[in-house]
Amino acid sequence: MPKKKLTPPPPARQLRADAKRNRERILEIAKDAFTRDGAAASLDDIARRSGVGNATLYRHFPTRDDLIEAVYRSEVEKLAAAEQRFATTMPPLEALRAWMLLFIDHVAAKTLIIPVMDTVVGGSMRLIEGSRNLIHTAFSTSVKRAIASGELRADTDPNDFVRALVGVFHTTALPGWEQSARRLVNILIAGSRPTR
């Protein structure tokens, strides 16, 4: 008997424009709800405030965990997209500084939703691990662009920036951490400038 030829799965369908708008609206409302109410945020309320029925919410996000993961992933994707946007609208060093400050804002917002992320199977670390490549690539690309422009020393290691600012995440329980993190951005950049 001849072997049956396996056919590849069909490509993922792109969402219709209205379905995409619904999904984005649900994510925005869910982010606010999880930030305000924690993991106990009502999915029914999220659907209602998004202007969609429960069936639409569950079609996009079958479980609460799926919705939490999508909210987090969406925020990380926006952060990565901002790096690319800054790269096309600002000089390299200014773009790096702006993106690092935006990263601090991302960390500040994330501290409010971490308790919710911890309710996901595998916890917040699983979600953070999944976004590591996007964040690392954005840091690395931005630093390398500033090196190529001559605004940072050639021996500057993008990983130093990554380590320093990812380390900021571990200080968020301390008073004044955000102002300190913003100073750290200026210290990192000043310390990496070429000597004249």
Each predicted region: which residue ranges?
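Basic, helix-initiating cap at the start of DNA-binding domains
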Residues: 1-49, 66-69
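Short hydrophobic/aromatic patch on the recognition helix
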Residues: 51-61
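Short secondary-structure transition hinges
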Residues: 98, 104-138, 166-174
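All-alpha amphipathic helical-bundle segments outside canonical DNA-binding/catalytic cores
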Residues: 127-134, 148-163, 172-180
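C-terminal peripheral helix-coil segments that are non-catalytic and often amphipathic
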Residues: 1-10, 137, 141-149, 167, ...
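Helix-turn-helix/winged-helix DNA-binding modules
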Residues: 38-39, 59, 153
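Hydrophobic alpha-helical connector segments
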Residues: 70, 81-109
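Short, hydrophobic secondary-structure boundary micro-motifs
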Residues: 42, 112-118, 151, 155-156, ...
